[in-house]
A protein has these predicted regions:
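Long, hydrophobic alpha-helical segments
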Residues: 59-81
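Membrane-interface helix-boundary motifs at transmembrane edges
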Residues: 93-97, 169-179
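Hydrophobic cores of alpha-helical transmembrane segments in multi-pass inner/ER membrane proteins
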Residues: 71-78, 156-164, 226-238
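Central hydrophobic cores of alpha-helical transmembrane segments
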Residues: 177-191
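Alpha-helical transmembrane segments of multi-pass membrane proteins
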Residues: 15-27, 31, 96, 100-113, ...
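Hydrophobic alpha-helical transmembrane segments
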Residues: 1-58, 197-250
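Transmembrane helix boundary and interhelical loop/hinge segments in multi-pass membrane proteins
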Residues: 75-95
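Secretory targeting signals
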Residues: 37-67, 105-175
C-alpha cells in the first residue's frame, strides 16, 4: 500500500509510468531505425509503392517516423488504462493521484519521443555521410530539421494522439463495449482536426472518400494553440470518465 502524501504518490506514479513506457519507446524507436536503414541499404529488395518524395530514402529518421510514431502513441494510450489503472488502485492510490501521475508521464513521454527521433536523425546523417550513401534532404513540415520548431510540433501531435487513445480506452473500461464505441467518433474527430490544422495528409488519404477532409491553412501559432486545446479536452474527458470509475477485480 502506498501511504505517502498525495503529491508524492503522483510523482512516484509519474516516474514509474514514464519509466515503463520509456522502455517500450526505446525498443520501438530502435526497431523503426533498423527498418529504415534496411530500406536504405536494400532498396532493390524492399520496394514501396510511393513517390520519390515519400520514400524512406528521401527523409531523415525524424520525418520517416512521424506517422508510425503517432500510431504508436495512440496504441500505448489505449493500452495504458488496462495495463496500469487496476494495479495502482489496488495499491491504495486514489483515482486523482493516478490521473495526475499519468498525465505527467504522458507529457514527459511526448517530449522524450521527438528527442530520441531527433538524436537518431543526427546519427543517421553522420552514418550516411560517412558511408557515402546519397539521399535527398527533404523536410516534411518546411522547417530545418535540427531547429526547435519540428520538435515542438511533433511533441504536440504525439501528446494528442496518446490522450485520444487514453480517453477511448478509459471509456471502454468504464462503460463497456457499447459505451466505449461512442467515444471512438470523439477521439477520431479530434485526431482528424489535429491532422487538418497541421496540413497533414494522413486523414485525407484514409477518409477523403467518405468525408470532406482538407488541410486547413493556419499559422503555426494557431495550430499549436488548437493542439493544446485538443489535449486539454481529451484530458478533461478522461478525468470525467475516470473520476468515480469502479475497478474491475478480474
Amino acid at each position: 500500500m502506498m501511504e505517502m502524501k498525495p503529491f508524492e504518490n503522483s510523482k512516484k506514479i509519474a516516474f514509474d509510468l514514464f519509466y515503463v513506457q520509456m522502455v517500450w519507446t526505446l525498443w520501438y524507436v530502435s526497431f523503426l531505425f533498423v527498418v529504415q536503414f534496411m530500406m536504405l541499404l536494400l532498396p532493390d529488395f524492399i520496394k514501396l509503392n510511393v513517390s520519390d518524395a515519400e520514400s524512406p530514402a528521401s527523409m531523415y529518421f525524424m520525418n520517416f517516423g512521424l506517422t508510425a510514431s503517432k500510431t504508436y502513441m495512440l496504441v500505448i494510450g489505449i493500452i495504458s488504462s488496462y495495463a496500469f489503472l487496476k494495479h495502482y488502485i489496488h495499491q491504495g492510490v486514489t483515482r486523482k493521484d493516478y490521473f495526475v501521475g499519468s498525465t505527467i508521464a504522458v507529457i514527459l513521454l511526448s517530449i522524450l519521443l521527438p528527442i530520441l527521433m531527433w538524436i537518431l536523425s543526427g546519427v543517421q546523417y553522420l552514418i550516411l555521410g560517412w558511408a557515402g550513401i546519397p539521399r535527398q534532404e527533404s523536410v516534411v513540415i518546411g522547417y530545418e530539421m535540427f531547429s526547435l520548431m519540428p520538435f515542438i510540433i511533433f511533441t504536440l501531435q504525439f501528446l494528442v494522439y496518446y490522450l485520444a487513445g487514453w480517453m477511448v480506452s478509459m471509456s471502454f473500461y468504464r462503460f463497456g463495449f457499447f459505451g466505449g464505441m461512442l467515444s471512438i467518433p470523439v477521439g477520431l474527430a479530434g485526431l482528424i482536426l489535429l491532422d487538418m490544422v497541421w496540413g497533414g495528409r494522413d486523414a485525407e488519404k484514409l477518409l477523403s472518400d467518405w468525408l470532406p477532409i482538407y488541410p486547413i491553412e493556419l499559422t503555426t501559432t494557431t495550430a499549436m494553440l488548437t493542439s493544446l486545446v485538443l489535449a486539454a479536452v481529451f484530458i478533461l474527458l478522461h478525468r470525467l470518465i475516470s473520476r468515480n470509475i469502479v475497478i474491475k477485480i478480474k
